[in-house]
A protein has these predicted regions:
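Acidic, metal-coordinating catalytic segment for phosphate/diphosphate chemistry
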Residues: 1-30
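Conserved Nudix-box catalytic region and its N-terminal flanking loop in Nudix hydrolases
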Residues: 31-71, 75
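Nudix hydrolase/Nudix homology domain
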Residues: 44-46, 115-164
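Active-site segment of metal-dependent pyrophosphate-handling enzymes
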Residues: 74-111
């Protein structure tokens, strides 16, 4: 005997999780502004990316962003901005959608980058160069927002997060 299906067929949900952050570092302002890209040495080997990483237990997203910048580049930021956007993508191996709040940090020309072992190369590039170099469409969409709202003109002060 077939029982009637109420409210349509049974559906399978997939999880949506937020356990990581994405950080764009910017040098300069206007059309000549540059962003830091790093080449991955292990996971997704050979692809270029911005700073990204996990939120550790007990951390806020902005604390994780500052820590990841320090770990991956050796740069200690005094201020970070909420990017006012989330990067999102589907992870088939985990059957989930990942959301990552985006943050932005500004770096002076004299600041030196010191990579950890997650990356084997870095380059400061203009935003058009960065768009051409990154692999994923979601990165490009997020980068376009960051360029428009943070590199072409000073950001809104209400997005500022003071770290010290």
């Amino acid at each position: 005997m077939n029982l009637p299906v109420l409210n349509g067929p049974v559906k399978q949900d997939i999880s949506v999780t937020c356990d990581g952050v994405s950080v764009f570092l910017i040098k300069g302002m206007g059309r000549e502004a540059q962003t830091l890209l790093m080449r991955r040495a292990k996971t997704l080997k050979g692809t270029w990316c911005q700073v990204a990483g996990s939120i550790e237990k007990g951390e806020t997203a902005w604390q994780a962003a500052a820590r990841e910048v320090r770990e991956e580049t050796g740069i200690t930021l005094q201020t970070i901005w909420s990017g006012d956007i989330c990067e999102q993508f589907y992870e088939p191996e985990k059957e989930r959608i990942a959301l990552m709040p985006v943050f932005v940090g500004y770096v002076e020309d004299w600041v030196k980058v010191r990579l950890n072992d997650e990356h084997d190369a870095f380059e400061w590039v203009t935003f058009p160069q960065a768009h051409a170099r990154v692999t994923f469409p979601g990165q490009r969409r997020t980068m376009q927002h960051v360029e428009k709202e943070f590199a072409r003109h000073p950001p809104l002060d209400m997005l500022r997060i003071r770290l010290s």
